Amino acid sequence: MSKTWRPATQLVHGGTLRSQYGETSEAIYLTQGFVYETSEAAEARFKGETEGFIYARYGSPTNDMFEKRMCMLEGAEDARATASGMAAVTAAILCQLKSGDHIVAARALFGSCRWVVETLAPKYGIDCTLIDGRDLANWEKAITPKTKVFFLESPTNPTLEVIDIAGVAKLANQIGAKVVVDNVFATPLFQKPLELGAHIVVYSATKHIDGQGRCLGGVVLSDKEWIDENLHDYFRHTGPAMSPFNAWTLLKGIETLPLRVRQQTENAAKIADFLAEQGKVAKVIYPGRKDHPQADIIAKQMTGGSTLVAFELKGGKDAAFALQNALEIIKISNNLGDSKSLITHPATTTHKNLTDEARAELGISPGTVRLSAGIEDTDDLIEDFARALGKVSA
């Protein structure tokens, strides 16, 4: 298989494993276990002396195809597909830590990710320090002799802050810590954390990789040594494996990832520019705009903008609700990366469990709204916003 294939080709052909029947579409191997020709063959398989599958909780041919395709796209040596994005995040963090270890995490995280490092990890004796990840000095100040993991997402959910991944990786390497990056918002098409120095990348495949709101899934990607030493046993014994059916569904979704993301990004950029000109909008945050606070870092580490737009309405929560309720094409939903345009009010949905103070620190105000642009006609989406804004009180 050619390593020179470009992403669009990798996503259609990468990792394909055909049976003796020569099917054009990847097969779904819906089986719990696998048969061995002899007892000796079973023994050798379990000893690791021969390659092959043992049990679907450990891996399956369908999952293997999906993992290999993700590795090609990300530039990773190895990967494990998980039942959800949160299963991937939890596995990537907990599999390499023990009681007494310390995590430094950017405070701007998806609500459930923040719960894992701030609430779950301490139950196992793992300390966590949350920082404003935009300033590299904060990462350095938070380091202790027990620091083993740096965790961040970039761009962040929902306010699209950007963190200097290469800078964080440099600090981590100085102390032998690992950098885990949640790359969901950038997608592997616009940002490759491993090339920037990160050690582990996680995705919620539920989002852009599926792209059509059908199934849950996640992926952890890293070098083979790290996977073997940290994730292998955790994966076998705790059971976060993706189902073969979901792996097959994601194989179908990922084929069109470049086409969808291209249209979604074009829509997001044009909608961001439109919203920036509206009097009822206090501010717009979009990684493709020159007025983004971290535009210099974006130019250095990202090759494209985003399918997401964050904006703040002057009228606060009432204005946000009025806008969302008046939209016709764009649907209210907390999901993202879908072919359909989706909108949500983070303060009352994805980040509702944070205190008012914590939300304010993240830049989430009562008027903050997050748009996940879909693949619809751009003009229809802008007209939908124009109509809805007309129903928002000044």
Predicted regions mapped to residue ranges:
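N-terminal "arm"/small-domain region of PLP-dependent enzymes with the aminotransferase-like
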Residues: 2-60, 68
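C-terminal core of ALDH-fold dehydrogenases
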Residues: 10-29, 318-358
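Conserved N-terminal alpha-helix of the aminotransferase class I/II PLP-enzyme fold
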Residues: 38-87, 112-119
